[in-house]
Amino acid sequence: MRQTKALIQRIRHINTQIQHVELGIEEDLSDIKPGQSLLIRQDEAWHPYLREHWWPVLIGSQKLIVERPAGLKYEPGNFINVLGPVGTFFRFRRNLRHMLLLAYDTLPTPLLSMIPMLIANQTSITLVLLGTASSYKTEHLPAQVEVLHGTGDLEWDNRVMTVGLADQVFAVVRPDDEILRFSKIWHMLGDLRAEIPSNYLFGMFQPVQPCGAGACHACMVRLTQGTALSCTDGPTFDLTQVKL
C-alpha cells in the first residue's frame, strides 16, 4: 500500500441513489485488482481524522470508477489524497461456472468490481439483494447479471435452485454487526446444502480502517485459529475459517 493522489476526471449520476466518480490514477495504483479498495482524504486537512473508504466498481488502464452516494458533491479537476490499494484481491475457484453474490442490508458496491472479470470468463452471475439492499437500483448493471430480491429473513423466490447452482458465494452485509449477519447467511446456506466446504462461502468485511496498513489492528477479524486483519489479509475471508 502506498500514499499517492488521484484526479477526479468525470462524475456520472447513475440514479437518485448513486453516482460514479471516474479517477485518473498514478502508476502507484496501476496494480489495483478487483476486491481491493482505497482510503481517501479529499483535502489536506486532518478533519475528519478517518479517511473515507472507497470501493472501485470498474478498473481500467490508468483509471478507476468508484461508486459513491448521490448526495455527495465532487468536482472534476480536483485531486484527492489516496492510500491504496488496501487489502487483497478476490480469489475464485477453478472451473467457476456460476457465482452467487449476496448483499444483506447494505449496498452491493464492494462486490461489483468482480463482475467484468466474471463476464469475460463466461461465468454466470446472480446478485441477490436482501432486506434493505432490495431498494438498490440495478439498471446500470450489465444485462448478464441476474438480479433477485429477497427479504430480511433471507428468503427469495427459487432460493433452493439459486443456491444449488452456485459454485461459489460472496456476501457483503451491513457493517454494524457483520458477525451476526454472516452467521445468518451461514445457517441459511447450511440448511440448503449437505455441507459448506472451504473456498465456497466468503464474507467481505467492512470495518473502520484508521490506518489501512496493519499497524493499528482496529480491523481485526477473529478466526477459528488466531486472528487476521481486514486491511492486509482481507477484506474477503472464507467463512469456514471465521469465528462466527
Q: Language-model features: where?
A:
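Local cysteine-cluster metal-coordination motifs and their immediate loop/turn environment
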Residues: M204-P235
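Ferredoxin-reductase
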Residues: R2-N78
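A generic structural signal for residues embedded in beta-strands
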Residues: I40, N81-L83, V221
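Short, Lys/Arg- and Gly-enriched loop/turn segments at beta-strand edges
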Residues: A45-W55, V86-H98, C231
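FNR/FR-type flavoprotein reductase catalytic core
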Residues: Y74-Q209
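Nucleotide-activated chemistry modules centered on ATP-dependent adenylation/adenylyltransferase
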Residues: L189-R193, A213-G214, T224-Q225, P235-L244
